[in-house]
């Protein structure tokens, strides 16, 4: 039993929240009995009881309590059980990752149809306790869920069973009669699964405007309108009731069960999208279809031979009265052999004699040609798809080899290049991520990049506590880089244009001689983040301060300075925060020159003033040009108005001129 401190101490908030109602009930019971306990004693007793039950000694504690005197002990025992249940039956949500929360918003919760149609309670009344009167959400199967796929696997088995064994039992009488009980059990078990499958289909949701429909009435209406519903109904017609009249040796009465073939095809389609080896699955699927066709053709050949008569000619199955041809295994294997030779057209079979035999062989030849063409075409395309990446990679190697031979590259360098390509192929690093993800929307690209690079990005100090949008942009701009043994990632004094994050491999910080190692960097380390920020006052500027060399093959992530600055233009606050973090890191390492900061600040002030004057001058020039344009427009309008006035005055002056008046006076005098 756990040891408990018996001194009066303050219990935890969780214990207090559980004990609030319990203490009140206990006080009422104890006050009614005239007994008193201090709060410390009550708390100690309750904690003691809880620990007793947590350690698995609930039975012993219960026995000791019920054998004691007084209802108060019984009430404390019940209250302790209530407290223990509240602690252990309460499921706490896992602590979320704050880093992930910045990429994902609040999770949208799909509202059920009952909640959408629910009306608020009048007067704000609470619903009855225990959830009475509240409808439960209907069970709806999501077609993209794992449960639905598992059910497809389960229903595909009886469909495949019917397609393989019904025709075989119908053609080979011994197979049906010798194992009748087994077939009855399997048949009606398959029928039961067919019935359950109809119920599952009636509760399988579908998408409408991007949302899953969960209304059972709409689901049933949608299902009944499909062709699958009609085929499912036909596949469940109890045609085997004719057994009662014809006997049990007619399994062909159950051929309507073959109409459920769509479930088998759906299972194959979903498996092809889920498997990591789709090409292998396609080849296996094609072989399975071919075997089923050969199997059916063999059974039909034996049935035709039985109809014509065994041994009546050279084409049909030999006489079954002979012991070697009377066995069931020989009958099926002989028929399967004949069917394989006929459909594949690779062997000689006895020629047909009767017309119906000729007709059947002609149909078999046509089907065989189609099967052969299908197999050759599909297998050829599958093999080419399987080797497409290898062929493309080999073409790159061949072009590199030809170039190195043309440029007369040294053998040592040529060997290093070939080994680098071999390493890429052996470790499956030849995939072009941009080419693979180019068809995805930006949101899914970001999600994939976050899942791939999240652990790596979380380790970089300057990128911690950045806003989510900036981190998404940076994650999308990370580029993989692979270095060979002995390659220099950076050298002392080089201008820093990238920062690197080690995903896999080991890098050594070496001296100028390239041999002496100061420190070894391993997975998760990063370097070069300060040089791409252009921290003002840095003694090293944006140049590298160390020589870093790859010990073996190293897989790194690279973030270029141009990509970072392009991203930070949209996030000025984040840019200032990153520069401040970088400055603090440099100050800790005593790599900040205050005089240089002041000088650069003065230079920056002068530059800002010059930029301000230039912008002001540009503004003045723009305003002057606008005013000049307005002045020119007003002058044009004024000239047009003056011209109009002159023309009007000219017309009026011409109408009342002095010459006209003198002529009128002369005419009057005459």
Swiss-Prot record:
Sorted UniProt keywords: Cell membrane, Coiled coil, Ion channel, Ion transport, Ligand-gated ion channel, Membrane, Sensory transduction, Transmembrane, Transmembrane helix, Transport
Gene designation: Cnga3
Chain segments carrying region C-linker: 388-464
Subunit structure: Forms heterotetrameric channels composed of CNGA3 and CNGB3 subunits with 3:1 stoichiometry.
Pfam families according to UniProt: CLZ (PF16526), cNMP_binding (PF00027), Ion_trans (PF00520)
Biased composition annotated in UniProt, kind: Basic and acidic residues: 129-138, 657-670
Reactions listed under catalytic activity: Ca(2+)(in) = Ca(2+)(out); Na(+)(in) = Na(+)(out); K(+)(in) = K(+)(out); NH4(+)(in) = NH4(+)(out)
Tissue: Expressed in circumvallate papillae of the tongue.
Name of the molecule in the record: Cyclic nucleotide-gated channel alpha-3
Positions of the UniProt region annotated as Ion conduction pathway: 278-386
Gene Ontology terms: biological process: inorganic cation import across plasma membrane; membrane depolarization; monoatomic cation transmembrane transport; monoatomic cation transport; monoatomic ion transmembrane transport; response to cAMP; response to magnesium ion; retina development in camera-type eye
Residue ranges of the region described as Cyclic nucleotide-binding domain: 468-588
Ranges that cross the membrane: 153-174, 185-205, 231-249, 255-273, 281-304, 328-362, 363-387
Cross-referenced PANTHER family: CYCLIC NUCLEOTIDE-GATED CATION CHANNEL ALPHA-3, CYCLIC NUCLEOTIDE-GATED CATION CHANNEL SUBUNIT A
Stretches assigned to coiled coil: 606-659
Binding-site residues for 3',5'-cyclic AMP, renumbered to this chain: 544-545
SMART domains: cNMP
Record flagged with keyword Nucleus: no
Stated role: Pore-forming subunit of the cone cyclic nucleotide-gated channel. Mediates cone photoresponses at bright light converting transient changes in intracellular cGMP levels into electrical signals. In the dark, cGMP levels are high and keep the channel open enabling a steady inward current carried by Na(+) and Ca(2+) ions that leads to membrane depolarization and neurotransmitter release from synaptic terminals.
Native source organism of the sequence: Rattus norvegicus
